[in-house]
Design a protein with these regions (language model features):
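Short amphipathic alpha-helical interface segments
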Residues: 1-35, 72-77
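Residue-level detector of intrinsically disordered, flexible termini
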Residues: 10-13, 53, 66-69
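Generic leucine side-chain signal with a strong bias for well-ordered alpha-helical environments
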Residues: 13-16, 46, 59
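Alpha-helical DNA-recognition elements
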Residues: 40
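Short, amphipathic alpha-helical interaction segments positioned at domain boundaries
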Residues: 61-78
C-alpha cells in the first residue's frame, strides 16, 4: 500500500508531543514509534538520533514547535 510519509511523520511528531516530558537535557518523548518515521524525523532535524539505548528521544527546538503545531492541527477540538 502506498502512503504519504510526510503525513505519517506529522502524526508521529504529534504523538511525540502527546507524551512529552522535560528533563535536564530538554524536551524528550518516548520513542515507541515506527523506526522509519523516527529516522525521517531525525533526518529533518526535528529529533535527536533515535538509535540509542535510551527509551526516549530529544526534540530539537524546531521539533518541539513543529510537534505542538502538528498536535493542535490533528488532535484538538475546534
Amino acid at each position: 500500500m502506498d502512503y504519504d510519509t510526510d503525513k505519517v511523520d506529522e502524526a508521529a511528531l504529534a504523538l511525540l508531543y502527546l507524551n512529552l516530558f522535560e528533563d535536564r537535557w530538554g524536551a524528550r518523548a518516548w520513542k515507541s514509534m515506527p523506526w522509519e518515521a523516527m529516522d525521517r524525523l531525525h533526518e529533518k532535524g526535528l529529533i535527536g538520533d533515535p538509535k540509542s539505548k535510551a527509551k526516549s528521544v530529544v526534540l530539537s527546538e524546531e521539533g518541539l514547535i513543529a510537534a505542538e503545531v502538528a498536535f493542535r492541527k490533528l488532535f484538538t477540538s475546534p
